[in-house]
Regions:
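Short beta-strand->loop micro-motif that forms the acidic, two-metal-ion catalytic signature
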Residues: 41-44
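Catalytic core of pol beta-like nucleotidyltransferases
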Residues: 1-22, 31-36, 47-111
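Conserved H-loop
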Residues: 28
Length: 111
């Protein structure tokens, strides 16, 4: 299991390097049901160009990940708003039930 301090530390590292609008923890660690096999799930909301996978890989490569799995979902604020507007249940769950670990002063999503 991953300690809460390590989770917060990773969120702050993402915030420092990527300057996102928000970093949201979702999945079993956010909902209080992690197991030894649980991975860490973050939604990182930030303006960017290109495909989200490339941005996720760029961020992931800069993080000190030791012995656990990390899933990064990277979306622009516009992409998140689009998914919410069409009723994407997965995105709604992340926004409504996830834990915001970092939020910039200029965040536009979920206000």
């Amino acid at each position: 299991m991953i300690e809460a301090t390590k989770i917060l530390q990773l969120a702050q590292q993402i915030a420092s390097m990527a300057r996102p609008e928000k970093v949201i923890l979702f999945g079993s660690y956010a909902y209080g049901q992690p197991t030894d096999d649980s991975d860490l799930d973050f939604l990182v909301i930030l303006p960017f160009k290109g495909h989200w996978v490339y941005k996720a890989v760029e961020i992931r490569q800069q993080l000190p990940i030791d012995n656990f799995s990390l899933d990064l979902l990277v979306r622009s604020p516009e992409q998140v708003q689009e998914r919410l507007a069409i009723g994407d249940l997965f995105m709604q769950e992340i926004i409504n039930k996830g834990k915001v670990l970092y939020e910039s002063a200029y965040a536009r999503v979920g206000q």
